[in-house]
Amino acid sequence: MKREEIADLMAFVVVAEERSFTRAAARLSMAQSALSQIVRRIEERLGLRLLTRTTRSVVPTEAGEHLLSVLGPMLHDIDSAMASLSDLQNRPSGTIRITTVEHAAKTILLPAMRTFLKSHPEIDIQLTIDYGLTDVVSERFDAGVRLGGEMDKDMIAIRIGPDIPMAIVGSPDYFSRRSVPTSVSQLIDHQAINLYLPTSGTANRWRLIRGGREVRVRMEGQLLLNTIDLIIDAAIDGHGLAYLPYDQVERAIKEKKLIRVLDKFTPDLPGYHLYYPHRRHAGSAFSLFIDRLKYKGAV
């Protein structure tokens, strides 16, 4: 087989995996028109249609899926081989792209970076704050950080933090207008300041203990915010009850700006995990970052 034919087949694999000529062209750094001609040339050579094209997507035909299943692993083996060669460099380098929730960034990732980045000056880290359940593969992240149990089962998940004590809090001003709840059922009479979840377009449900078992409660409220700091400010201003990690409101509680309630009904949340796809080649920079983050305390 000629070298050009091999290159054409590799280009087809990228189009079939991306399900898009636009994304494939960007990944291969070539024009969409040239990529379309390559695929058409392969189809003419084989006498088979490999892709079904629509205005919004590209879907492999049965023949295309078969070809992808054979060639895809070969391409990834080549990528892994090239990546392993780059790892032979004396100093790990590159950019590690992580999608994470705000609390994990503040309490785990940023503290870990204080020494990590000083020790590895040629490694860059990009953090993107996002409360959605991000697909790290399609969004081009190296890994994501979410609570244990939230990531897909086909991901490798590594625990990077302890369980998280939660707190329900309200301001003295709020409780001057509303009774202090003493049971989960009484929360129906209260306003909540909720965390916005972009994946579902709804508010975060509160994990509480009711009747001896954990339940997820949807709270009603007029405010839907997307950062912890804004929720804390709104709670201090008396807009309602907030459900937050205890370490983020501990100071405000000690300063009597907030009052904690229902602490016996708020179970700890499972600790944060770093997750990434099984097929991802763990380069030296990424491996070092994983080793730095691994939780070494008692689970």
Curated annotation (Swiss-Prot):
Residue spans binding DNA: 21-40
PROSITE patterns: HTH_LYSR (PS50931)
SUPFAM superfamilies for this protein: Periplasmic binding protein-like II, Winged helix' DNA-binding domain
Gene3D superfamilies linked: 3.40.190.290, Winged helix-like DNA-binding domain superfamily/Winged helix DNA-binding domain (1.10.10.10)
Domain HTH lysR-type, residue spans: 4-61
One MF annotation (Gene Ontology) recorded for this entry: sequence-specific DNA binding
InterPro entries given in the database record: LysR_subst-bd (IPR005119), Tscrpt_reg_HTH_LysR (IPR000847), WH-like_DNA-bd_sf (IPR036388), WH_DNA-bd_sf (IPR036390)
PANTHER family associated with the record: HTH-TYPE TRANSCRIPTIONAL REGULATOR (PTHR30537), HTH-TYPE TRANSCRIPTIONAL REGULATOR PGRR (PTHR30537:SF1)
Protein family: Belongs to the LysR transcriptional regulatory family.
Described purpose of this protein according to its UniProt entry: Regulates the expression of genes involved in peptidoglycan (PG) degradation. Could play a role in switch control between recycling and degradation of PG peptides. Negatively regulates the expression of the ycjY-ymjD-ymjC-mpaA operon by binding to the PgrR-box. In addition, other genes are predicted to be under the control of PgrR, including genes related to membrane formation and function.
The protein's name in its UniProt record: HTH-type transcriptional regulator PgrR
Record organism: Escherichia coli (strain K12)
Name of the encoding gene: pgrR
